[in-house]
Each structure stands twice: as C-alpha cells, then as structure tokens.
Amino acid sequence: MSVPLLKIGVVLSTMAMITNWMSQTLPSLVGLNTTKLTAASGGTLDRSTGVLPTNPEESWQVYSSAQDSEGRCICTVVAPQQTMCSRDARTKQLRQLLEKVQNMSQSIEVLDRRTQRDLQYVEKMENQMRGLESKFKQVEESHKQHLARQFKAIKAKMEELRPLIPVLEEYKADAKLVLQFKEEVQNLTSVLNELQEEIGAYDYEELQNRVSNLEERLRACMQKLACGKLTGISDPITIKTSGSRFGSWMTDPLAPEGENKVWYMDSYHNNRFVREYKSMADFMNTDNFTSHRLPHPWSGTGQVVYNGSIYFNKYQSHIIIRFDLKTETILKTRSLDYAGYNNMYHYAWGGHSDIDLMVDENGLWAVYATNQNAGNIVISKLDPNTLQSLQTWNTSYPKRSAGEAFIICGTLYVTNGYSGGTKVHYAYQTNASTYEYIDIPFQNKYSHISMLDYNPKDRALYAWNNGHQILYNVTLFHVIRSDEL
C-alpha cells in the first residue's frame, strides 16, 4: 500500500476515535446524556451527537461528525453566553477540551493537506513510470523493426549480388582467354619479325606505297564523312551565363592546332568591344580576357571569326568588314548589294539581325533579304579575302518569319521561331538549288535564342539563349558509295 493511502487511513481512524471519545465524555462532563440527530452548517452530517442542557442558552453545545461532503472531519463546539457559572470547574474543563479539539482539528487539516500533496506527487510519479514503460516498449519494438529492416536490406543486397556470380565466372574465363590471346600475339609478333628480316628492300617499298595509298583513300573518305544531312540536335550544354539577352560568341574553325580561343560580343548593336579568352576553360571559369575595340560598331548578332579575322556588319549599313584580330586593322570592306539593313529584314526576334554571316565546311556565307526577292531569304557564298559574292541563291522563305538560321555542308537550315517550342523545319540545298520542309526539334532551354551558328571544326551549334552561352551537338547522315573510296 502506498504512503498517501496509509496516511489517509491514519487520519480516518483518528477522526473516528475523537468522535467516539467526544460522544462519551462530553455529556458526562456537563451532566447530560441526550442524543439527537441534527445537521451542521457548511455540509450535511452523516452522524451528529448533541449535548443539550435544560436551558441551551446557559450551557455548551458540542457537535461532532465523521466527515463532511468533502471528506474532512468536522468538530464544532458552541459556547454559551458568559455568566457567573462559567467559572466553575466543568466550564474550565470544557474550555481546555475545546482548545485541544481545535488544535487537533488544525493538525488534521495540515495532515490532510500533506496527504493531498503526497497523493498528487505519487500520481505524478505513477504517470511518469507509465510513460517510461511505454517508451521502453517503443524502443524495444523499434529495435526489433530496425533489425528487421537491416535484415531485409542485407537480403535485398544479396539478391542483387546473386546475378553477379555467373558474371564472375565468365570474367575468370575471359581472363584465361586474354592470357591465351596475349601468348598468341607474342607468337605472331615473333613470326612477323622473322618475316620482316626475310623481306627485301623492294618488297618493303611496295608495302609502304600500298600503305600511303590506303591513307589517301581513308583521308578522302573522312572528308566525305565530314559532310552530311542534319538528322538530329542534342540537348543543350550550358557553357556560361553572362551578358544581356542578346549577343554572340564563337571560336575560330581554322585556328591553329592546339589553339582554342573564345570570342565574346555582348548586345546586338552600337557596341565596339570584343572579348578574347585564351581558352574555353578560361571562358567558362574566369573573367580573364583581352578586349579588342573595333573601328566601327556592329549590327545584329551574325558575326563570325574565321582564320584569324572577325567578319561583322557595320551598324546601320549593308557594309561587311573584315577585321584582323592580331594586327587590329581593317583588311577589307564591301557593300552587300541590295541587302536590307537597319531592321528592314530582320529575324523574327528583331535586334538588327538583317545580315547574318556564317561559316561551314565550304567557307564563308552571308544570309540576308532584298526587296528584289520580296523580303525572302537570300544566300551568298563570299570570298573570305575579298568579300566578293561568288554565287547567290534566292529562296522562297520570308526572312521575318525565320527564328534563326545556320549552314552545314552548304545546306541552309531555318528554325520556325526563337522562343518556346522550337524546331528546324526548312532546309535549302545550295548544291542542288532545292528545298524541303523538315521536322527536327531541339530544346529551347532559356526561351529566347538570338544567335545560332554552326562550327565545322567542333561539329556543334553555338547559341546565345537569353544571356546563356550554350552548345548543341549535331547528328549528320552520310551516304558514301563504294566507287568513291
């Protein structure tokens, strides 16, 4: 049994003893033995004992109760009015008894408060113990679940590793086969060394000629493989995020071996400064560049770098300028006859993109529109040194409806727009003067293409898309006849 319950039992026993003693002793003290059922104020009494004299106003009235409605012991003594008789021995004894009863009642109240406090403490401790017991059960169940999960994970891992057993067996067999091949190659090498010693000088020269002939045929084959029909464009590769919404960037397809400079031109008009980065890595990771100031501002985003020179359209004119980047001098200027300029025949996105210069495997090109061709696209093959037009083709595609354009292997490819979903849907073959509508989608990742050019060295499309410099790899389809080898 808990401590609070023991204390409550002691209190109730003490109260019962006091009540019994008072009911037997008080009447004998005052000389009365009358029993009466009554009620006390402040609560309903289960049992009351009254001591009533013949004249209640001149004597004591004592009431005792086992408990009230709240479970507490009530002892009440009503003193009579003071008279000369109150000084007798019995009155003195009653007063002393009253003081004892009052002291005992106060002690009982203190004991009751302590009991209530201890009971609350025990209940609190009991709740905490129940909480700890629940937590221990949860920890135990969680531990079991954790072990089960670990077991399942190990079992799943074993199931994943099980298929590797036959692979390991095959690997062992392949290792033996590789050793066997190695021995055979060593034997073959020794045989070839013996044959080389037996072959004379004449036979060696004949073999060398055959090898040279084969190299020439392979080189011709590679040249044919360099050109083909566009069949696919890869997902974009973001190289850098820099500059305004409009601009152009490029590398030189005829740069010396080992040189990989990047040229960067922000904005589409009334700007003269060209940034030169030493390498693609510098362009991607640093802001270390050399600045070149052009003698005239450019127009549009159709500039190209070709064989050490930059070709651009002079602002508010149809003049093309060739500027040497090494000596920083103008090498040649020429007017592109009848070409529209100053936003007369721009691409769909605007931006003074009337004249677009391009480079492919065949050299330098200019794409523009004229009044004579009703604003439709015109293609001119240019001499890179003199800028003279070598040959011109008139197409039936309106230049203002084109999003952007680029040339691969002499074929002009035109996109249907510059924002949102974009695709290449028109192709004009200059070698046959024919065109066709195609459907080659590509991802317009940043929703605003203002420059799209092909680089034959990298076989990739360079694009400026809403302040992002990106690359697209291209897939070309080749058809080579056996008599061409």
Swiss-Prot record:
PROSITE patterns: ER_TARGET, OLF. It is found in: Secreted; Synapse; Endoplasmic reticulum; Cell projection, Axon. Contributes to the regulation of axonal growth. May play an important role in regulating the production of neural crest cells by the neural tube. Homotetramer; disulfide-linked. Dimer of dimers, giving rise to a V-shaped homotretramer. Component of the AMPAR complex. Keywords: Cell projection, Coiled coil, Developmental protein, Disulfide bond, Endoplasmic reticulum, Glycoprotein, Secreted, Signal, Synapse. It holds the Pfam family OLF. The keyword Disulfide bond applies. This is Noelin. Disulfide bonds join 227-409.
